[in-house]
């Protein structure tokens, strides 16, 4: 019954002469908040998720960037000079003054000089894990946004479609295709907004992961250089 009525409406619309639409202006902002109370709640929630994801991204991005810029460019060369000169305490103090992830990792290794190499490696790996965890703080919250935002948008779309077809099934007298189309494009707008929030959030999340991966690679190379240094004949 419903499909028959929809077909009649569609054929009637095709048979009707086209109406001039030159004065119509597409406004996605109006579409976003065109629906009922539930649609507005979904839209506001998704937009808040978008703002939240941007805050997390910039906070983590500049935090990681600030940490990466603290280490001296000649850090490893200076450490090598201290070690070769036998100034272990000075090397440890130099690492502390850096106040950087690299400095803290090497300081753990220097503080265990004289012990088995496995102890030195374990100490540096443990500190590296602490530094990575510090960089990844709240990153799991950002990872959730690309999953939740489209689902909320899809929920809004499904509810909107249900409402649109419910109104169609209970319509009396002649029914305008405009009424149905408004319900459909309003509902689809929910999914569009969800995707518009999820895609940049996913992109931002992967940018942060890439920067953290670069730090991990840098820390591994630095640890390897340090182990080569302490095992090198003086």
Can you say where each PLM-predicted feature lies in the sequence?
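Alpha-helical transmembrane segments of integral membrane proteins
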Residues: 39-56, 146-150, 156, 197-201
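Residue-level signature of catalytic and energy-coupling elements of molecular machines
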Residues: 36, 54, 91, 106, ...
């Amino acid at each position: 019954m419903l499909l028959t009525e929809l077909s009649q409406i569609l054929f009637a619309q095709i048979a009707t002469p086209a109406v001039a639409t030159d004065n119509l202006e597409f406004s996605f902002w109006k579409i976003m908040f065109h629906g009922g109370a539930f649609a507005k709640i979904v839209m506001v929630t998704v937009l808040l998720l978008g703002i939240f994801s941007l805050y997390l991204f910039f906070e983590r991005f500049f935090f990681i960037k600030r940490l990466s810029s603290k280490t001296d460019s000649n850090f490893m060369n200076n450490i090598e000079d201290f070690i070769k000169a036998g100034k272990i305490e000075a090397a440890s103090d130099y690492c502390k003054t850096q106040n950087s992830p690299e400095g803290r990792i090497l300081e753990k290794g220097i503080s265990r000089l004289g012990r088995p190499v496995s102890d030195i490696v374990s100490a540096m790996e443990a500190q590296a894990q602490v530094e990575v965890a510090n960089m990844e703080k709240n990153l799991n919250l950002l990872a959730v946004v690309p999953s939740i935002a489209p689902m909320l948008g899809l929920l809004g779309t499904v509810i909107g479609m249900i409402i649109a077809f419910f109104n169609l099934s209970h319509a009396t007298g002649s029914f305008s295709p405009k009424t149905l189309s408004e319900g459909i494009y309003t509902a689809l707008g929910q999914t569009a907004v969800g995707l518009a929030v999820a895609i940049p959030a996913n992109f931002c999340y992967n940018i942060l992961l890439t920067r953290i991966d670069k730090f991990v690679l840098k820390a591994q190379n630095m640890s390897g250089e340090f182990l080569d240094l302490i095992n090198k004949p003086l």
